[in-house]
């Protein structure tokens, strides 16, 4: 079974840049997209044959949102955190299959001045972990998406200069550590424990992508 995940930073813009061709090439069983920035009715698209589309869009127009495309039979679809915390931003979308749950997640960004860090640390991260454990009591859980945190120094190019930068604060890293302590596995780091320079996000400034000055903030 093949699962893929991508923060598209706007599904409408990404459709114009070849999203459908990419989906066709990947031939994944399930495609999880984050930061869709659109409602279903705003997107005029015919998805590749065999895929069913499940949306969780933000109430605020053009903001956040998740989308899961699946070719596998889906038993149920759940939006949000099951009542543990209000999700008006379309950040969590859970699809249930015969033998596991798949949780597509776009974790809130703490913001440049860390104004959302208290919410992230005290409310979101604990509620998300509790939600996952509640699901896990029923059947195995796979979760993926943009978690907006580089967990360890190896997961970003410049850890020393970013210790109080959003995405690498001790509070955000602790939230991820709690997921690991609860038994969830960072798949990439488990397979490649010492491999540095592997990132999923680069700033648009200072030619960062060409120089590979990046962060690994997206996970399975």
Region roles according to the model:
Residues 1-9, 99-114, 144:
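Active-site-proximal beta-strand elements of phosphoester/diester hydrolases
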Residues 1-47, 58, 63-64, 178:
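N-terminal, active-site-proximal structural segment of metallo-dependent hydrolase catalytic domains
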């Amino acid at each position: 079974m093949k699962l893929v995940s991508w923060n598209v930073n706007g599904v409408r813009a990404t459709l114009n840049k070849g999203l459908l061709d990419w989906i066709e090439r990947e031939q994944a069983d399930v495609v999880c997209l984050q930061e869709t920035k659109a409602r279903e009715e705003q997107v005029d698209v015919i998805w590749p044959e065999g895929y069913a589309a499940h949306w969780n869009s933000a109430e605020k127009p053009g903001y956040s949102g998740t989308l899961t495309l699946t070719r596998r039979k889906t038993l149920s679809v759940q939006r949000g955190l099951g009542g543990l915390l209000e999700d008006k931003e379309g950040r969590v979308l859970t699809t249930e299959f015969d033998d596991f749950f798949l949780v597509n997640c776009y974790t809130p960004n703490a913001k440049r001045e860390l104004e959302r860090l208290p919410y992230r640390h005290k409310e979101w991260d604990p509620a998300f972990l509790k939600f996952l454990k509640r699901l896990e009591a029923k059947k195995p859980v796979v979760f993926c998406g943009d978690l907006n945190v580089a967990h360890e120094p190896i997961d970003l190019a410049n850890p020393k200069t970013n210790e109080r930068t959003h995405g690498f604060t001790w509070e955000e890293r602790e939230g991820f550590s709690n997921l690991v302590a609860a038994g969830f596995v960072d798949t990439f780091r488990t397979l490649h424990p010492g491999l540095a320079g592997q990132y999923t996000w680069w700033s648009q400034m200072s030619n960062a992508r060409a120089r590979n000055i990046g962060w690994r903030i997206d996970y399975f």
